[in-house]
Amino acid sequence: MGCNLKDIAPAQQTSLKALAGKRVGIDAFLTAFQFLTTMRDRSPQGDGMPLRDANGNPVSHLMGFLHRTATLLAMGIKPVYVFDGTSPELKADEMAARRARRLEAEAVHKEALAAGDFALAQKMAARIMHYSPQMVKETQQLLDLMGVPWVTAAAEGEAQAAVMAAKLSLIHI
């Protein structure tokens, strides 16, 4: 969904160095999807799906959160991850459309694998990523073990982060 706010609140570039010592709100779902769509099996005959452990469980999200969070902490940045809660009713049509696109991509992915078209399979794999409730729980457990705070919004994480930024001297990214 999203909103185009550039006319009323233009983006401002900043360096990570400038954020040292500050609490920074980070959209956990956006971050997770970055990891799930980039840290994938891209070997010549890879299926394009997220990296997995020996039992076939996806681990791209954990590897990504661990590395990025450790890097931020080493730079003196205090991350606060904000997870989305329940989607608002207003977003129901958009969520249904996303599900339909994901199902269509899953069918193409399966056909591409069966046909040995690994390039197409990898392209489609990026479109079928799903940050499951189990993956969210694993991420939150990892953050707990790292001593990094996180919150789950009542609805949209971006809105929660904006409120936190206004009330808690949190910089929202």
Language-model segment annotations:
Residues 8-14:
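A short, compositionally biased domain-edge/stem linker segment
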Residues 165-169:
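Short, surface-exposed basic-aromatic patches at helix termini and helix-loop junctions that form
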Residues 171-173:
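Conserved small/polar residues in nucleotide/adenosyl-binding loops
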